[in-house]
Amino acid sequence: MEGAAVSAAGDGPAVETGLPGSPLEAVAGATAAPVEPRKPHGVKRHHHKHNLKHRYELQETLGKGTYGKVKRATERFSGRVVAIKSIRKDKIKDELDMVHIRREIEIMSSLNHPHIISIYEVFENKDKIVIIMEYASKGELYDYISERRRLSERETRHFFRQIVSAVHYCHKNGVVHRDLKLENILLDDNCNIKIADFGLSNLYQKDKFLQTFCGSPLYASPEIVNGRPYRGPEVDSWALGVLLYTLIYGTMPFDGFDHKNLIRQISSGEYREPTQPSDARGLIRWMLMVNPDRRATIEDIANHWWVNWGYKSSVCDCDALPDSESPLLARIIDWHHRSTGLQAEAEAKMKGLAKPGASEVVLERQRSLKKSKKENDFPQSGQDSVPESPSKLSSKRPKGILKKRSNSEHRSHSTGFIEGIVSPALPSPFKMEQDLCRTAIPLPSSPEADMSGKLSLKQSATMPKKGILKKTQQRESGYYSSPERSESSELLDSNDVVISGGLSSPPPDPARGTSHSLSCRRKGILKHSSRYSDGGTDPALTRPEMPTLESLSPPGVPSDGISRSYSRPSSIISDDSVLSSDSFDLLELQENRPARQRIRSCVSAENFLQLQDFETPHNRPRPQYLKRLADSSFSLLTDMDDVTQVYKKALEICSKLN
C-alpha cells in the first residue's frame, strides 16, 4: 500500500492530474514554490454509467457522514483492498460544499507521497460521486494511542517524522492541510502514517493571506480562533505542535471545558507541561509560539535535532541551518531555553498571587485526550441578521472558528469554511466571502484572568480522569472530508459550549464544591500519588522535608488516644512510604543537621562556570540524590572533558538567537 499510487484498470480515458497545469492551479493561481518534476500520479476519471459491484466486492462500512459513507471493498480482478467513498449529490444543498469536495479530489489526486492517502479512481454521474482510494487497515492514529495509552519516544519519533515528511511535501507544493489531527492520520498494515481528509486544504501563496477560519478547535492556532488572516503553513505548524504533545504525553495541551477558556489558553499559548519532562519539550514550545513569525516552520521542524535523533539523514531534503552543531550542544541550548522559560513562568505566578481575586479564575487541568470536532461542528452565528453597511462590515474583525449557533440553524456547512484569498480578480468559486462571517468572538477582558489562570491547578476539587477516554459509538471515519457534519454537533448549541467531543471527561460537578475550594484532607505528612505534596506546590519540584518528632510516634500508640483506624486510615498510607512503621530506622534524626543546598541550586546555570565551588563536603548533594542527579539531563555532560567550554559556547549561541 505504501509508495507510489497505482492507477486502477477500467473503462474511460485516464486523466493525469498534478499541481503544474492542473485545473485547480488554473482556478486558484500558482503554487508557493517551484514544483520539482515527479512521477505522474494517474487517476481515472469516469463520467458514464458504471456498475461498481461488478468490479468491487463491497464489505463493511468504515464511516458515515452527511453526504454518504465510506466502505471497505476488494477489487475482484486484482484482490487489492480499497476504500470506496460515495457522495450523494442530492444531499449537497450548498454549491460551496461541492466546490470543496471537488477541490479535495483535485488536491489529493495531485499529491503523490508515501504517507498521504492516494486516490485511484473517481466515478461521477448525475446522482453520485464515487472515490476509490487507498485503504489504511490499522485505522486512525487516535485509536492506536487509545489502546496503548502512551507511546515510547522511539515510536513517537517514528510517527512524527512521517507526518512531518508528508506536511513538508504539501508545503513544498503549495498545499496547506489546515485540519491536521489524530483522527485524520491513518495507519497502514506496516504502521506507517497515511494522512487523509484534505477537505479543508487549499493552495497558498507566500505573499497572500487566507481568511478561512476552519479546522478543529483543539488543534486551532491563535490566528484561527481570533479571526486574523494567515498565510497557511503556520497553521499546520501549530497543529503539529499539538500532535507532538499528544503523542508524547497522551493528553491534549489545550483542553478548556468551554470555548472561552479554550480561546484564552490558545491565544496565550498557555499549556501545562507534565512533571515527567521530555527532550522534545523545546520543539513543542517552538511550534506552539503564539506569534506566527516566531513559530517554527516546517523546515525548522524537519531539521530539528530531536526529530532526526538516531537517524542518518534529515526528514526532508531542504537546506539545514547554517553551521549546525552537534545534537549534544543543541540539547544544552534547548535546556537553557527551558530553564529561562521556567524562571519567567515562576515570576509570572508570583505576580499573579499579589492580584486580588486571582484565585477565582480556574484553569482546568487537562488530563485526557479528547476527540476533536469537525470544522462545521463549531457553533455558528446566525446568518439571517439585518444587513449592515459596507463601512461597518469592513471595520469589524472577522470571526474565528469557535462561534455560537442558534438552535434554529441546522445548515450542513460552515460559514467559517468559506474560502477566501486576499487578492483581487479571483474566479467566483474561490472568491472572498468573508462578509458572511463577521461576528467576533468575545475574549476574556480581565487581565487578572489571563495572568492567574495557572494558580489553581492543585485547588480543583475534581480532576478529569487521566488517560485517553474513548466512547464506543459510530462516528465519521478519517477518510471523510471535513465539510460533513458529525453526530455530536448538537452538543455545542448551548450557551456554555463544551468544545470537547464524546471522549471528553465530564465537567466538574457543582455539588462537590467550587474549583477553588480546597478538598478535605487530613493534615500531616501523607504520601500522595507516590510523592510528597503540600497541596500548592508541584510534587515533582519539592524535596521531602524532615518530619516532626510528634509525627514519629508509634502507629499503635497515637498521642491523642484514638486508635489508628480512626486517626489515620491505612488506605491513605502507601506501602512504600518513608513514614511506614518498617522504615523508621532509616530516618536521619540528628538535631543539628547542617543545612544543605537543593539540587537545583547545586547545578544551576549560573554556577556552571564555578564548578570548583561544589567540591567541598558542605555543598555536595545528599547520597540519596546522587542517582537522581546522574539520571538528569546534566548526565550528558559527564563524558566531556571541558564542560565549561561547551556551556560557554551554548550561551553564545543562545545570545545570538535572542
Curated annotation (Swiss-Prot):
Record field: catalytic activity: L-seryl-[protein] + ATP = O-phospho-L-seryl-[protein] + ADP + H(+); L-threonyl-[protein] + ATP = O-phospho-L-threonyl-[protein] + ADP + H(+)
Tissue expression from the record: Expressed in the developing central nervous system, in epidermis, and some other tissues.
Cellular component GO terms held in the UniProt record: cytoplasm; fibrillar center; microtubule cytoskeleton; nucleoplasm; nucleus
Modified sites of kind Phosphoserine: S22, S456, S601
Enzyme class: transferase
Active site residues according to the UniProt entry: D179
Binding site for ATP: L62, G63, K64, G65, T66, Y67, G68, K69, V70, K85
InterPro entries: Kinase-like_dom_sf, Prot_kinase_dom, Protein_kinase_ATP_BS, Ser/Thr_kinase_AS
Keyword tRNA-binding: no
Region listing for Disordered, in residue ranges: 1-53, 353-422, 441-568
Sequence ranges of Basic residues compositional bias: 40-53, 394-405, 519-530
Keyword terms, alphabetized: Acetylation, ATP-binding, Cell adhesion, Cytoplasm, DNA damage, Kinase, Nucleotide-binding, Nucleus, Phosphoprotein, Serine/threonine-protein kinase, Transferase, Ubl conjugation
Subunit structure: Interacts (via GILK motif) with PPP1CB; the interaction is direct and bridges NUAK1 and PPP1R12A. Interacts with CDKN1A.
Protein name, per record: NUAK family SNF1-like kinase 1
Name of the gene: Nuak1
